[in-house]
A protein has these predicted regions:
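Surface-exposed, glycine- and small/polar-enriched segments that build interaction surfaces at terminal
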Residues: 20-205
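Hydrophobic h-region of N-terminal signal peptides that target proteins for export
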Residues: 10-18
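Positively charged n-region of N-terminal signal peptides that target proteins for export
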Residues: 1-4
Length: 205
């Protein structure tokens, strides 16, 4: 019974993903974007408005409406430009972006990772990890880490910022709207607390 239920759920989930547009198990992109949201100069299969469910290689920069699987890039993955929902691993020397990462997104880049809306997973880079508007559940590690809404997990960097925090922030400057967890840093801010700033170690519950 459990096996039958699992199969039914898997089929329904796959049908939901594939119903959002055409898809391919393999994708490839050649070229760079001239400007954000401008696909001139990019030769890509499948097209940006379609999806890849499996493996995509970008010999420059790539973007798809949905990208589920492994996405290595020679330059960057820019799925947010196609409002793409990403599930899986993005790896690029420059940057990775995604429209959403609710399926579970893992971003590893040299400089910058961004999810425009809510996400689960981890972001690892040198300079800035950002979840712009929604929640983030997972790990962020870079010089700067930012979550626009609720955060559950761990942020490690010089500057960490989020909405309601459940978890841990480790850095020089930590900033949260509310705290149910731990902040370790030179300055720790909780804007909805009577004592907004507290040094070194701060515990909230």
């Amino acid at each position: 019974m459990k096996k039958v239920t699992f199969v039914i759920v898997s089929v329904l989930a796959s049908a939901t993903l594939f119903a959002e547009g055409r898809f391919s198990p393999i994708g490839m992109s050649i070229g760079l974007y001239l400007t954000p949201n401008n696909y001139e100069g990019v030769a890509q299969f499948p097209l940006c408005e379609d999806g890849v469910y499996g493996f995509r290689l970008a010999l420059g920069c790539a973007a798809n409406r949905n990208m589920v699987g492994l996405a290595p890039a020679v330059y960057a993955n820019d799925d947010a430009a196609a409002r793409g929902n990403v599930g899986g691993l993005q790896v690029a020397p420059a940057f990775n972006t995604a429209g959403k990462g609710e399926l579970g997104v893992w971003q590893v880049s040299g400089f910058y990772n961004k999810v425009a809306d809510s996400a689960n997973g981890f972001q690892v880079c040198a300079f800035l990890n950002e979840v712009d508007q929604g929640y983030f559940y997972g790990l962020q590690t870079a010089l700067g880490n930012k979550v626009g809404a609720d955060f559950c997990g761990m942020q490690i960097g010089l500057y960490n910022a989020c909405g309601a925090e459940t978890g841990m922030q480790i850095g020089l400057w930590n900033d949260a709207k509310s705290l149910c967890g731990i902040q370790i840093g030179l300055l720790n801010f909780v804007t909805e607390s009577p004592m907004i700033c507290f040094p070194v170690l701060r515990i909230g519950w």
